[in-house]
UniProtKB/Swiss-Prot annotation:
Organism: Xenopus laevis (African clawed frog)
Function noted in UniProt: Plays a critical role in regulating mitochondrial ultrastructure and function by maintaining the integrity of mitochondrial morphology, particularly the organization of cristae. Plays a crucial role in ciliogenesis. Plays a key role in the correct positioning of the annulus, a septin-based ring structure in the sperm flagellum, serving both as a physical barrier and a membrane diffusion barrier that separates the midpiece (MP) from the principal piece (PP).
One Pfam family in the UniProt entry: FAM92
Protein name per Swiss-Prot or TrEMBL: CBY1-interacting BAR domain-containing protein 1-B
Region spans: BAR-like: 11-221
Compositional bias ranges of the Acidic residues kind: 267-285
Alphabetic keyword roster: Cell projection, Cilium, Cilium biogenesis/degradation, Coiled coil, Cytoplasm, Cytoskeleton, Differentiation, Flagellum, Membrane, Mitochondrion, Mitochondrion inner membrane, Nucleus, Spermatogenesis, Transit peptide
Length: 285
């Protein structure tokens, strides 16, 4: 005995519902894993950024004033960005990943509903086969045939009722699925938009702090560090003393031209000879 048109329709509906449930289970599972991985990578990026902030602060402490100030301010802004990234991670986890995870339990319930429906279908098919056998074995026994027909009718009614319930359940499931997937992706986009909006604001401030670094001033500080003030003062004193000492030690004759110095020596010799002549004259008298 072949299936009735109603039974065939119910079977087709059940197969379609089963395929729909399998499809949701497969793709929601994949989406859940991918979104969870996205959140983990975002959290790791936050951790790496924290390390960057720490290193920038450590390096800034060794640098010249405006470079230090600029790097410190950059690090503060970048640390603020990581606070927003942490909020992004928490929101993605609670508003995207968790709702997808919850579909694991929902799918399990739908599979239970499918099992109940399939069991009802099997009972209907079994009663139909039993009625066919009864008619073949006892074609004249109306009582047994009537009893088998009653059992089949009861099984058919149960199968129809359960199929109707399953159809309503799956209809609600499909409606909720569409609503949830729409909300889920809207939440994802909103969370990312909020984060990137804040990121643009913070990174703009960080960029400005870097641009405010005065290269010339820092270079001048570095150059001055090569010649400490006390060393420069001592050097200036030594140079000044050297100049003044050379001036005070120079004899007056040094300033005379060589010709004058020779003339003076000749005059001194002539004066000495005149003195000797005068002494000799006095002795003769």
């Amino acid at each position: 005995m072949s299936q009735t048109p109603e039974a065939r329709t119910r079977d087709n509906q059940t197969r379609q519902i089963q395929e729909s449930v399998n499809n949701v289970e497969k793709h929601f599972g994949e989406l859940c894993q991918i979104f969870a991985g996205y959140v983990r990578k975002t959290a790791r990026l936050r951790d790496k950024a924290d390390l960057l902030v720490r290193e920038v602060n450590t390096y800034a402490d060794t640098e010249t004033p405006t470079l230090k100030h600029g790097l410190k301010n950059f690090a503060d802004e970048f640390a603020k960005l990581q606070d927003y990234r942490q909020a992004e991670v928490e929101r993605l986890e609670s508003r995207v990943v968790e709702p997808l995870k919850s579909y694991g339990g929902i799918i399990k319930l739908k599979r239970e509903d499918l099992k109940v429906t399939l069991s009802a279908r099997n009972r209907e098919a079994k009663q139909m086969a039993q009625l066919e056998k009864t008619r073949q074995r006892n074609p004249s026994d109306r009582q047994i045939i009537s009893q088998a027909e009653t059992e089949l009718q009861r099984a058919t009614m149960d199968a129809a009722r359960i199929s109707q319930q399953l159809e309503e359940t799956i209809d609600n499931f499909e409606k909720q699925k569409i609503k949830d997937i729409k909300k889920l992706f809207a939440e994802f986009v909103t969370i990312e938009m909020v984060f990137h909006g804040k990121a643009l604001e913070v990174l703009t401030a960080a960029y400005q702090h870097i641009q405010d670094i005065d290269e010339e001033e820092d270079l001048e500080v570095f150059r001055n560090s090569l010649h400490p003030p006390d060393f420069q003062s001592r050097l200036d004193i030594v140079r000044a003393n050297s100049r003044s000492g050379s001036t005070s030690r120079a004899p007056s004759v040094i300033s005379q031209p060589p010709g004058n110095r020779q003339k003076n020596r000749m005059e001194d010799d002539e004066d000495g000879e005149d003195d000797n002549d005068e002494n000799s004259t006095e002795d003769e008298n």
